A protein has these predicted regions:
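Conserved beta-strand segments that form the floor/walls of ligand-binding pockets within enzyme
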Residues: 65, 101, 143
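Pocket-edge positions in alpha/beta enzyme catalytic cores
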Residues: 34-37, 99, 111, 142
Length: 151
């Protein structure tokens, strides 16, 4: 979570019930949120995080299985949001990745998401408001699904 601590005023880690033990694996200051209905899909985890965040100018939604994102990428997303972007997402060579930032104007729609597609549909709905932030960071595409992915 150090990746986000440098840039974000608050870092919230959303877990499903029973996964609180991951707290032992995370260093640094963060707030823990349990998404009671996480089994419904990632949309419920996003909603739980937004609810817990409360009042903030923006949120950057990062995925725990993407530890190779560069801190510079997170900084660029935050600066783009500070500049007034509604949605800011990293892009490299025409491909978009994660994490994605959202202006507080979209907190309501983020809490209304359904299923396990994350915010993809919301991004599509607001495509004219999306700022693609060009980065040189392949970590925006690299996720960890198995222990061997860490090498």
């Amino acid at each position: 979570m150090a990746l986000y601590e440098r840039v974000c005023p608050r870092v919230l880690v959303v877990v499903k019930p029973g996964d609180e033990s991951v707290q032992d694996l995370v260093t640094g200051p963060c707030e823990w949120v349990v998404a009671r209905d996480a089994k419904v899909g990632i949309s419920r985890s996003i909603a739980a995080g937004i609810r817990a965040l409360g009042s903030a100018p923006w949120v950057i939604i990062g995925l725990a299985d993407m530890p190779y994102v560069s801190p510079d990428t997170v900084s660029q997303i935050a600066r783009t949001l500070d500049g007034g972007a509604v949605i800011a997402r990293p892009s490299s060579r025409g491909r978009t990745g994660n994490p994605v930032g959202f202006n507080s104007r979209l907190f309501g729609p983020l809490m209304d998401l359904k299923g396990d597609l994350g915010a993809r549909a919301l991004i599509d709905d607001y495509i004219r408001d999306v700022v693609d932030v060009e980065v040189r960071d392949q970590g925006i595409f690299r996720d960890i699904d198995r222990p061997e992915d860490l090498t």
